A protein has these predicted regions:
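Conserved phosphate-binding elements of NTP-dependent enzyme cores
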Residues: 1-940
Length: 940
């Protein structure tokens, strides 16, 4: 078997005919600048070819269901194993997917609870057990000798009635005594019961004294009692206590029955066992009055009501109803909403409850008065939401809806009967709600009977193993109940990594995309240990990574570069860490050797003296903390994974400020108040989501520079002569675009059993525009020629056009000079998309009162890109703005003016402020994990 993977002539995307040999069964790191071609080589070439070969081995019938993979642009690859990609892009958005279901641990839990779980009565909490007559007799015979007992048949439990028929029946059956509501009666006497009172009736079947000779008689008496009372029997230990027994899986006191348990009973996707109100989701959507009227300082006439169809600007009907309510409840539509009487506001939101309003109808025929009631904005929205079949209409109403925990199941997703089943004193939801670290402790310390141990041993081992794997990749703070849709890309990737370790496969080629993302430096060693374990099983790992510790732990490093885009795509160096360091062309090597580094600022900014303060932050695991954000500074929010950073910044700070400053409709996390908002005028969240989801979106359209370019072309003599306006130069509308390809420049040809083929449009030759439009030139270049230019070329070409040049210059400033002006948004990496957004902000005129939020902006960035990012962020702060980043990257953290370090641990062990202050102050804090790793960097 070939000991190497040999690649010849790799040309996918920007790769420049790369030849490369990498060793098998090793930990290999692919590194290089963002956009250099690492992912093109790892995912789009090596993984794509491995997948394609597997799919090609299947029948044509099977291939039509799997979809075809296009052959990557490479001459030859030898030594490939079956390839598994573990990236960050495939997190399930299904609300039914949880960490437990994704890892399949929940399947094992369902099996465990079905086989050894103990059901309880939902009313009294009594343990429900299924017993035979012999087991009941054996339990009774364990009582001390000479103990006096009564065998009772509980025929009536807490029911109203006179029960004449029942009493007559047991009298005819030959029984002598009966106990009614605790008092013993002789059946020969007349027993009258109050009809409207609840009664308990027990037939006294036998009276015995415990000794060795009564077993046969006791058995007969128990059988008689269970026959009378539907399988139930009460053993009254005279002068002591009573014990209830049942032949059924039912509470002998309340009759709560549970069917024989099976794994499917514990699935919240099973309609018979899922909570009836939420259908197994654990939550439901409801209209939030705070989103219907987000700003109570506005009046109704100023448009305070933001709900679909109910703004006074939407039409006369809304205004007509609101005027009727205002007249009825005595207020003006021009006063702020928070000054409207409570009953008046309630009538607007929830209706008049049948009370008639005096309305005035105004039509073209005249005016008239009439009376009608009003159902209310919220009931109206709810009715429309439930009745409409239009996705657009539902989406419009969902803008004012919020997700709430189901009041019936409290988020547990299952019925009370299923939730009553416990193992080790915890039901399945209580177990899944604990952090993984606590779940592991619980499983390790589970006390079981010998029978339970024998039945559950294998299942418990599987659960323990999988929890250990999740723990080993730094996910100990997550819970199995956590929705998969709420996971970050890094968390989702590490979950899949843990699942793969659990499969214990050998001879597989794993390709991972930055597994260290979202991981605190403290947990990085755990991750590296996990990767090495996967390698030691006999697998090859290719890891696309920028983390220095991962590179130093690798067996082999491949450095792609030297630059990005058209300036990248070359093999710079391949070998050990020392080989990379000794390569003069390697930018990675320069940072590894320390020849280049991101400097620590000589002094920290003082800010503008103003501050933004969050009081009583309690979202998720935040422990009622007060946090100050000094304005005019670069602020880093740090802490181990799960310490509460996103809860504070994204859920509370961003959502609240977006509502107040930008008029958004978001539901912030739980907090008491936020002060200092009047010192800001805008909040902007710059994340790594795509700048567009179709090939028609590109950096030019996103930054707005394409509008300026089209305006410029419309001003050329040729365009004026032909009467062309700016829209003539858009490839999105009819007129100037090529109609054969509708402005795409390419045409799709379906090949059925082969991959679809995309070929250049024959009419326009791939140039997207028709001939007349392309004939219009500026400085000898058509509009298509401009879109094909790199940003660097465009900046030089438009140097004399200030509006265009300024926007292109900001793209250069953020290090995107290599991308094409018209490059499809779908081909940009997350880091590149984020920098396009940063450039767009830099090109705007700053008021100096903006706060920028960035969540792990270093994702996908090489150290050289991080260096450039710090420069860009400095530009934003130097303009008087405030930048808040959630970050684990120490190179970013050390350049901050102010750090808010949360922790000390993740999950329940987090949610408090460990330390705030400058990086130097954090480094001096012994309790701060961040400070411990930061200290050596500040000394360099």
């Amino acid at each position: 078997m070939n000991k190497n993977i040999v690649i010849k002539g790799a040309r996918e995307h920007n790769l420049k005919n790369i030849d490369l040999t990498i060793p098998r069964d090793k930990l290999i790191v692919f590194t290089g600048l963002s956009g250099s071609g690492k992912s093109s080589l790892a995912f789009d070439t090596i993984y794509a070819e491995g997948q394609r070969r597997y799919v090609e081995s299947l029948s044509s019938y099977a291939r039509q269901f799997l979809g075809q993979m296009e052959k990557p642009d490479v001459d030859y690859i030898d030594g490939l194993s079956p390839a598994i990609s573990i990236d960050q892009k495939t997190t399930s958005r299904n609300p039914r997917s949880t960490v437990g279901t994704v890892t399949e641990i929940y399947d094992y839990l369902r099996l465990l609870y079905a086989r050894i779980g103990t059901p309880h009565c939902t009313k009294c909490g009594r343990e429900i057990t299924q017993q035979t007559v012999d087991q009941i007799v054996d339990r009774v015979m364990e009582l001390d000798k000479k103990t006096r007992i009564q065998i009772l048949a509980p025929i009536v439990k807490g029911r109203k009635g006179e029960f004449v028929k029942e009493l007559d029946g047991i009298r005819k059956s030959g029984f002598v005594r009966v106990r009614v509501d605790g008092s013993v009666y002789d059946l020969s006497e007349e027993i009258k019961l109050e009809k409207n009172k609840k009664h308990n009736i027990d037939v006294i079947v036998d009276r015995l004294v415990i000794n060795d000779d009564i077993k046969s008689r006791l058995t007969d008496s128990v059988e008689t009692a269970t026959h009378l009372a539907d399988g139930n029997v009460v053993v009254d230990i005279v002068g002591d206590r009573e014990e209830l027994f049942s032949l059924n899986y039912a509470c002998p006191e309340h009759g709560a029955v549970i069917e024989e348990m099976s794994p499917r009973m514990f699935s919240f996707n099973n309609p018979f066992c899922a909570c009836k109100k939420c259908g197994g989701l654990g939550s439901y959507k409801e209209i939030d009055p705070n989103l219907v009227i987000p700003n109570k300082k506005l009046s109704i006439n100023q448009g305070a009501v933001k709900a679909s169809g109910w703004s006074v600007k939407d039409g006369a009907i809304a205004k007509m109803y609101f005027e009727g309510i205002a007249k009825e409840y005595g207020f003006s539509l021009d006063v702020p909403v928070d000054m409207i009487p409570k009953d008046g506001l309630r009538a607007i939101l929830y209706g008049t409850g049948g009370k008639k309003l005096k309305m005035k109808r105004v039509t073209s025929y005249g005016t008239g008065d009439y009376q009608t009631d009003f159902e209310g904005v919220i009931p109206n929205l709810k009715r429309r939401y439930e009745s409409t079949s239009s996705e657009w209409a539902r989406g419009d109403i969902e803008a004012v809806m919020t997700t709430c925990t189901c009041p019936d199941c409290k988020g547990a997703r299952l019925t009370p009967e299923i939730m009553s089943v416990t193992v080790g004193g915890k039901n399945i939801y209580e177990f899944c709600s604990m952090p993984i670290s606590e779940e592991l402790d619980f499983v390790n310390n589970l006390e079981l009977t010998s029978r339970q141990q024998m039945i559950g041993k294998l299942v418990i081992n599987e659960i323990r193993q999988r929890l250990s794997f999740l723990n080993s990749v730094g996910l100990d703070y997550l819970s199995l109940a956590r929705e998969a849709a709420t996971l970050s890309g890094g968390e989702a990737q590490r979950i899949r990594l843990a699942t793969q370790i659990g499969s214990s496969l050998m001879g597989v080629l794993y390709i991972l995309d930055e597994p260290s993302i979202g991981l605190h430096q403290r947990d990085n060693d755990k991750l590296l240990g996990t990767l090495k374990n996967l390698r030691d099983l006999g697998n090859t790992l290719i890891v696309v990574e920028h983390d220095e510790d991962t590179m130093r732990a690798a067996d082999f490093i491949v450095d792609i570069g030297p630059g990005a885009g058209i300036n990248g795509g070359e093999l710079i160096a391949a070998g050990s860490v020392d080989d990379i360091i000794n390569c003069e062309r390697s930018i990675t090597g320069m940072y590894l050797s320390g020849k280049r580094k991101i400097p620590v600022p000589e002094k920290r900014r003082n800010g503008n003296g103003k501050k933004l303060t969050v009081f009583g932050a309690q979202e998720n695991n935040l422990k009622n903390i007060d946090v100050e954000f000094p304005l005019g500074k670069f602020i880093a929010v740090t802490g181990v994974s799960g310490s509460g950073k996103s809860s504070l910044v994204n859920e509370i700070l961003y959502k609240y400020l977006a509502n107040v400053l930008n008029g958004a409709k978001k539901r912030p996390g739980k907090f008491e108040k936020i002060t200092g908002v009047d010192n800001l005028d805008k909040i902007i969240n710059i994340d790594q989501s795509p700048i567009g989801r179709t090939p028609r979106s590109n950096p030019a359209t996103y930054t707005g520079v394409f509008n300026d370019i089209r305006e410029l072309y419309a001003q050329t003599p040729d365009a004026k002569q032909k009467g062309y306006k700016a829209n003539r130069f858009s490839f999105n509308v009819k007129g100037g675009r090529c109609e054969a390809c509708e402005g795409d420049g390419i045409v799709k040809i379906e090949m059925h059993f082969l991959a679809d083929v995309y070929v250049p449009c024959e009419v326009c030759g791939g140039k997207r525009y028709n001939r007349e439009t392309l004939d219009v030139k500026f400085k000898g270049k058509s509009i298509f020629d401009v879109l094909e230019m790199t940003v660097d070329e465009g900046a030089e070409f438009f140097e004399a056009q200030p509006k265009i040049y300024r926007k292109l210059k900001t793209l250069q400033d953020v290090g995107l000079g290599y991308i094409k002006i018209g490059q499809s948004a779908t081909t940009l990496s997350g880091g590149e998309a984020q920098r396009v957004k940063l450039a767009t902000e830099l090109s705007k005129r700053s008021t100096g009162k903006t706060i920028y939020i960035l969540d792990e902006p270093t994702t996908g960035l090489h150290t050289a890109d991080v260096h450039r990012l710090t420069t860009v962020l400095d530009m934003l702060v130097n303009a008087g703005n405030t930048v808040v980043v959630i970050e684990h990257n120490l190179d970013i953290i050390k350049t901050a003016d102010y750090i808010i370090d949360l922790g000390p641990e993740g999950g329940k062990g987090g949610g408090t402020i460990v330390k705030t202050g400058t990086p130097e102050e954090i480094a001096d804090c012994e309790n701060s994990y961040t400070g411990q790793y930061l200290k050596p960097l500040l000394k360099k």
